Amino acid sequence: MSNLYESIRKYKCGYIEEILNILDMFDPLLNKFQRNSCYEDMKSELSLFMFNLIDNFPLEKDCFKEDKFIINYIYKSLKNKFIQVNKLHQKVKSYETNIDIIWVNNCDYANLLSTVIFEDIIKDLTQNEKNILRKIYLHGLRESEISRELNISRQAVNKTHLRALEKLKN
């Protein structure tokens, strides 16, 4: 294994082929992250990230004169990017699943999109607040109808409704 510091320095000086040597050094790590992810394009995402990482690498810092610090920096950066991409992929998968469920219920696309946006907006509310807002805005029920359905007073429904709207406003 050649000196990683020198390889990065040469790459920054214009020796483009050095990036391939650097990628080869970290190929086992990229393969490990690929195996540990259910996202098919994880290796290519991390490879592209690594290009950007090497382009912006702070070689002028004294601590990066030794390979062990460079390797640790690249490893931690790749690991953080791996976590970020995995979380994003899981969120997309979750939305795809929700969309599939809603699609089965014969909703048109505009309704589907507004439902997904609505669910994203109310995600931080309590379950009771979410339930009441869904009944009011998605199902078109009045507060009195909701109160009869939930066996609570209309004032309690109104209070929960206003509290939820206030939370969303802030």
Curated annotation (Swiss-Prot):
This is RNA polymerase sigma factor TcsR. InterPro entries: RNA_pol_sigma-70_dom, RNA_pol_sigma70_r4, RNA_pol_sigma_r3/r4-like. GO terms for biological process: DNA-templated transcription initiation. The lineage of its organism: Bacteria, Bacillati, Bacillota, Clostridia, Peptostreptococcales. It holds the Pfam family Sigma70_r4. Residues 143-162 bind DNA. CDD domains: Sigma70_r4 (cd06171). Disruption phenotype: Cells lacking tcsR grow normally but display reduced toxin production. Belongs to the sigma-70 factor family. Sigma factors are initiation factors that promote the attachment of RNA polymerase to specific initiation sites and are then released. Transcriptional regulator specifically required to activate expression of the toxin gene locus, composed of tcsL and tcdE/utxA. It comes from Paraclostridium sordellii (strain ATCC 9714 / DSM 2141 / JCM 3814 / LMG 15708 / NCIMB 10717 / 211).
